[in-house]
């Protein structure tokens, strides 16, 4: 396959073929908008790994019953606070009502709320994030907490990480020229490329990536960054594409952390982290085309 896509969080009940159908149409559109030919179905595949997070013995669509009391340890608290702070920053920018598709203007800043014990902080954070247009699209607060835990599990559960990376290895071939990673999938894509320098992949495209979040994600990567610099994956080009309102992609620019990354901003409206909106962007079409056609 010329192009391999790797999805992000909250795909517990979707398999690779389902995700491929969704991604392919959007990617074909992005390529056309950028003035390039479409790729065909037999040139594209997706890596599915959401089933590893699916609770066993439960009905489809079930998310574990989670609340603010289930936020565990400093890592989960800190990422939750970073999401809250970013949502509040975007809220403050939009209080003039200039952008109807921008963030809710009533989200209070964490500093306004004060600090306290983890359960208290988590409860306040979830209350404010429930106002966010982005997180509201996820549904209930238990879904947000479940997503938070998926990120931590991937980073720190070696057995789980190895299984997910094996799924990537099974999809990448000598013909693979481009890997696209969205959200947590960008972390998976990066680590898979670093672990397999023999691959013939030309271009990495990261969409809505959390790779640059210091201390929590960047510093937990494999291989470990040194002196504030991440290891360059074995690719010729790396395009990092983010919406300025994407709360998950807290660090919009990855070049300061990894070197010769081409950082690009796009506008996805209020669905700032939505993968289809990223894939249909002209910038994404151009980035993918450089790996396929040049």
Where do the PLM segments sit?
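N-terminal accessory alpha/beta regions
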Residues: 41-105
């Amino acid at each position: 396959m010329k192009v391999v896509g790797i999805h992000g969080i909250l795909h517990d009940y979707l398999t690779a073929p389902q995700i491929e159908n969704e991604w392919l149409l959007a990617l074909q559109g992005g390529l056309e908008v950028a003035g390039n030919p479409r790729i065909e179905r037999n040139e594209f595949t997706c890596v599915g790994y959401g089933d590893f997070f699916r609770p066993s013995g439960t009905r489809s669509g079930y998310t574990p019953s989670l609340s603010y009391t289930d936020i565990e340890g400093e890592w989960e608290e800190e990422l939750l606070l970073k999401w809250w702070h970013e949502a509040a920053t975007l809220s403050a920018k939009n209080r003039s009502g200039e952008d109807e598709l921008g963030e809710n203007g009533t989200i209070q800043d964490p500093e306004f709320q004060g600090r306290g014990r983890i359960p208290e902080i988590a409860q306040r954070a979830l209350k404010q994030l429930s106002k966010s247009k982005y997180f509201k699209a996820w549904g209930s607060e238990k879904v947000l907490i479940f997503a938070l835990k998926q990120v931590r599990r991937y980073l720190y559960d070696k057995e789980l990480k190895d299984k997910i990376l094996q799924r990537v290895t099974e999809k990448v071939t000598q013909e693979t020229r481009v890997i696209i990673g969205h959200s947590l999938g960008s972390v998976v894509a990066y680590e898979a490329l670093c672990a397999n320098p023999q691959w013939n992949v030309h271009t990495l495209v990261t969409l809505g990536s959390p790779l640059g979040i210091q201390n929590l994600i960047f510093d937990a990567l494999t291989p470990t960054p040194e002196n504030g610099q991440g290891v360059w994956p074995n690719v010729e080009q790396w395009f990092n594409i983010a919406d300025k309102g994407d709360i998950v992609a807290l660090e919009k620019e990855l070049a300061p952390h990894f070197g010769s990354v081409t950082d690009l901003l796009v506008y996805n409206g209020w669905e700032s982290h939505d993968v289809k909106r990223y894939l249909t962007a002209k910038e994404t079409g151009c980035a993918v085309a450089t790996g396929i056609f040049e």
